[in-house]
Amino acid sequence: SPRAVADAVYDALPNGYFAIEDVERTVQSSGMAEQYPGYAVGYKNQFKASYTHLPFDPRALFKFWFASHFKVFDTYMGGDKIGHFNDMGHRYYTRYVDALADGHASEQAHAAVLEFATHDPIFSEAGVLGYLSAGAYSNGDQAANYAGFLFYRNLTEPVALKGRLRSPLAVRDGPHWRLAEHVRPDTDFFAWFVSDHWDEALNPSDYDGLMRGGMERNIRERTALILWRYRDEHDRPRPREFFLRRAQDLRTYYGADYGHGGKADELLTIAEVCFPGIVNDDGP
């Protein structure tokens, strides 16, 4: 059954913690440094975190590592997104298929997933995984969770990814399942699940009052680096309008609600923080 396939794939993959640790070891390894000389394959500065303006880092009670930052399929992301994609994606999926099994239509089952994603006291960004442990509702995490949900659905059914309907990753072969022809190590099948929604600079978190001021200062101090990172193909800095449009686009997953949180005019977007003195009269 589709549920059995999804559970088998989930069980075959390392859990979120070990997956993140594996990636950390890889991107920080000497082998990666030799393969990409002159490049920082994974950037991490655990001694100057985004919360060091506080006398005590509140994440110390919950966080056991500081995830590196790296680029995958042209998207900047933190290593924690891998754990969100697999673990939380599977949680979303089980909620979805359980709702279907209870007789709910697909739209109702999807609504149940979003309710869990945005309001569960433990596993939502509004609860322990977000505001309580980090002082933030991470829209990047929400997007990775949702992409993982789409991945588990796409194992056995067509799913819209990046606005295009994609065929299943596995197909029936008599009584068994086998990988579809497009699922091969040398194809881009997995790139369809990774998007700029995972980039917490382009798709910022909604910070609580304790964190917001320090985060805004940290972003502003890094304005030159941020604008250089997102420069265009001619190495020119992009205009404010680019970041306005990008932030607006990333509020949904190509039109689908994935549980994005925060008012548009209150989020610490690049457009708002890195372009001081500009009146916001041309966009959200």
Where are these regions (language model features)?
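Intrinsically disordered, low-complexity, mixed-charge
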Residues: S1-H119, L129-Q142, Y146-P284
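Alpha-helical transmembrane segments of multipass membrane proteins
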Residues: E125-A126
